[in-house]
Curated annotation (Swiss-Prot):
Acidic residues bias (residue ranges): 341-352
Source taxon at top rank: Eukaryota
Notes concerning its domains: The transmembrane domain 1 and 2 function as a signal-anchor and stop-transfer sequence, respectively, generating a double-spanning integral membrane protein with a N- and C-terminal cytoplasmic orientation. Transmembrane domain 1 and 2 are probably sufficient to mediate membrane translocation and topology formation in a N-myristoylation-independent manner. Transmembrane domain 2 is sufficient to block the protein secretion pathway. The two coiled-coil domains are necessary for its endoplasmic reticulum (ER) three-way tubular junction localization.
PTM text: Phosphorylated. Phosphorylation occurs during interphase. Phosphorylation also occurs during mitosis; these phosphorylations reduce both its homodimerization and the ER three-way tubular junction formation.
Molecular function terms, GO-annotated: identical protein binding; zinc ion binding
Transmembrane parts of this sequence: 46-66, 78-98
Name under which the protein is recorded: Endoplasmic reticulum junction formation protein lunapark-B
Organism: Danio rerio (Zebrafish)
Subunit field text: Homodimer; homodimerization requires the C4-type zinc finger motif and decreases during mitosis in a phosphorylation-dependent manner.
Residues covered by region (Disordered): 142-240, 311-402
Mapped zinc finger ranges (C4-type): 276-301
The family this protein is said to belong to: Belongs to the lunapark family.
Biased composition (Polar residues): 205-222
Gene symbol of the encoding locus: lnpkb
Membrane topology: Multi-pass membrane protein
Length: 402
């Protein structure tokens, strides 16, 4: 009879089993959270009420029942000293009881989770793809996300080195240029970027022989379209043209670099980005002082970005050269020396001979003619032009009178 009744009972499906397991797991998780809240509540109440009772008892004993003898005082103070130890013991007992309940709850929770994991593995092996997908979406969304993340390939993040370009662009022709003459089948067209030098074809016609076919077959095009992660024909090439106007600072900086930047007053927060006005590309960063006066050529579209302001120039100072002054004074001295007669030049020598013969033992007498000679030599170049001017004026007066 029991066998017949057992046959009539239907076996629960996997969905029903998973639903019951989910319900039990949620109940256990709620019980664990509730248990932790109760532990905090009971411990807090114990400490609060025990401390309040302890203070009231101490006050009552001190003012009402505190005896005068020291022996009686010690006996009365013993319960007051033992009460804090009793409260700490009760606190440890509460923590121990609640921790035991939490451990039992965690054991049951782990058992239910292992049962659920086994059922899900059986579902993935036995059920169809559609049913398995629905069950996983409903009862195990985390494993589904992990499976999708493992299925989709992740491209490695390439960090550029200091000497490499951060990004590489291949700018297509935005407007059709002028129509050129018919080209030979062996040559490749040139692409010109706005504002910069022409860019060679990506296929590299110089490296391929003249008879080789440069057009891709339809099968190669289909393979490239099916694989989105395959590199393009010119992805490994460096775009021609000038480098960046200013170096781009590294994004990952250490503590020492930040301290140095703070002391020096340099860093990304103290710089402005150089953005191209045509293609809006990042061309490095410039200091605040030179940002308004920097003119740069874009490294991607080769457009010349003019400076926002012109740097003010200070007025030019007059040049002073000591050599020019000496050169300007030298013709006057030469002309004055040429006008001197040989008699005048020999006169100081005769005076020196006379003074030395007259007083040979007096050094002061020897120095005096020398000083007089130097004074006469300095005064002669100034007196000679004045005498010439007077002679010319007298000659003019005589001519007018005649």
């Amino acid at each position: 009879m029991g066998a017949i009744i057992s046959r009539w009972k239907t076996k629960p499906s996997t969905v029903e089993l998973l639903e019951s397991l989910d319900k039990d797991i949620k109940d256990l998780e709620e019980f664990r959270a509730k248990n932790q809240r109760l532990l905090k509540l009971w411990v807090g109440r114990l400490l609060f009420y025990s401390s309040a009772l302890y203070l009231l008892t101490c006050l009552c004993v001190y003012y009402l029942y505190f005896p005068q003898q020291w022996g009686a005082r010690l006996i009365t103070a013993l319960p007051l000293l033992a009460f804090p130890a009793l409260v700490l013991l009760l606190r440890k007992m509460l923590i121990f009881l609640f921790s035991k309940r939490t451990e039992r709850n965690n054991d049951k929770l782990e058992d239910l989770k292992t049962q659920k994991r086994k059922i899900l593995e059986e579902v993935m092996e036995t059920e169809t793809y559609k049913n398995a997908k629905l069950i996983l979406e409903r009862f195990d969304p985390e494993s589904k996300k992990k499976a999708e993340a493992e299925a989709t390939p992740v491209r490695p993040h390439m960090t550029p080195r200091p000497g490499q370009e951060l990004r590489q662009r291949h700018i297509a022709m935005a407007t059709p240029g002028p129509v050129l003459g018919p080209m030979s089948p062996g040559t490749t067209p040139l692409r010109t970027a706005p504002g910069g030098p022409p860019e060679k074809g990506l296929a590299g016609s110089a490296s391929t022989p003249a008879g080789a076919s440069q057009a891709e077959t339809p099968q190669q095009m289909m393979r490239r379209s099916m694989n989105p992660y395959s590199p393009g024909p010119g992805s490994g090439m460096r775009p021609p043209g000038p480098p960046l106007a200013r170096p781009i600072l590294p994004r990952e900086r250490g503590a020492v670099d930040r301290v140095i930047e703070y002391l020096v007053g340099d860093g990304p927060q103290n710089r402005y980005a150089l953005i191209c006005q045509q293609c809006f590309s990042h061309n490095g960063m410039a200091l605040k002082e030179e940002f308004e006066f920097v003119a740069f050529r874009c490294a991607y579209c080769y457009f010349m970005n003019p400076a926002r302001k012109t740097r003010p120039q200070a007025p030019r100072l007059p040049e002073f050269s000591f050599e020019r002054r000496l050169r300007s004074e030298s013709p006057e001295t030469q002309s004055s020396a040429a006008t001197e007669t040989p008699e005048d030049s020999d006169a100081p020598e005769d005076d020196m001979e006379r003074t030395t013969s007259a007083d040979p033992q007096n050094p002061a007498a020897d120095e005096a003619p020398v000083l007089q000679e130097s004074e006469t030599e300095e005064s002669q170049p100034q007196d000679v032009p004045h005498a010439e001017a007077e002679a010319l004026e007298e000659q003019k007066k005589e001519d007018e009178s005649n």
